[in-house]
C-alpha cells in the first residue's frame, strides 16, 4: 500500500534507538526508550498560507530528522510497519552528515 500525506504532513519511519548506555550497559524494554529520530518516507505538497499560496516543505524524502514525539504525532501500521504521521512543525531538526 502507498500512502501520500496531505498538505504539510510528513510520514516518518522511526529509527531504532541505541540499546547500550554511554557506559556500555545493554538497555532493554522501556529503559531503552523510543527514538525521536527517523527517516522521512513521504511528504505532502506544502503548507497552505493565509493568502492561499502553497509553501513547499523544507524536509524531503530520505532526510533523517529529529522530531517532537508529542500530541500531534499519529502512529499507524502500513504494510506491517509502524510509521508516524506528523506535521512539518513537529520536526525539530534535519540531521546532516
Swiss-Prot record:
Disulfide bonds: none annotated. Keywords: Chaperone, Cytoplasm. It is found in: Cytoplasm. Pfam families: Cpn10 (PF00166). GO terms for cellular component: cytoplasm. One of its GO terms (molecular function) is protein folding chaperone. The keyword ATP-binding does not apply. Belongs to the GroES chaperonin family. Together with the chaperonin GroEL, plays an essential role in assisting protein folding. The GroEL-GroES system forms a nano-cage that allows encapsulation of the non-native substrate proteins and provides a physical environment optimized to promote and accelerate protein folding. GroES binds to the apical surface of the GroEL ring, thereby capping the opening of the GroEL channel. Heptamer of 7 subunits arranged in a ring. Interacts with the chaperonin GroEL. This is Co-chaperonin GroES. It comes from Yersinia enterocolitica serotype O:8 / biotype 1B (strain NCTC 13174 / 8081). The lineage of its organism: Bacteria, Pseudomonadati, Pseudomonadota, Gammaproteobacteria, Enterobacterales. The gene is groES.
Amino acid at each position: 500500500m502507498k500512502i501520500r500525506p496531505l498538505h504539510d504532513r510528513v510520514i516518518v519511519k522511526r529509527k531504532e534507538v541505541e540499546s547500550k548506555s554511554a557506559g556500555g550497559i545493554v538497555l532493554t524494554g522501556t529503559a531503552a526508550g523510543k527514538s525521536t529520530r527517523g527517516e522521512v518516507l513521504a511528504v505532502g505538497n506544502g503548507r497552505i498560507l493565509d493568502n492561499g499560496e502553497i509553501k513547499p516543505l523544507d524536509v524531503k524524502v530520505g532526510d533523517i530528522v529529529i522530531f517532537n514525539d508529542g500530541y500531534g504525532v499519529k502512529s499507524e501500521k502500513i504494510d506491517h510497519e509502524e510509521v508516524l504521521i506528523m506535521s512539518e512543525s513537529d520536526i525539530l531538526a534535519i540531521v546532516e552528515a
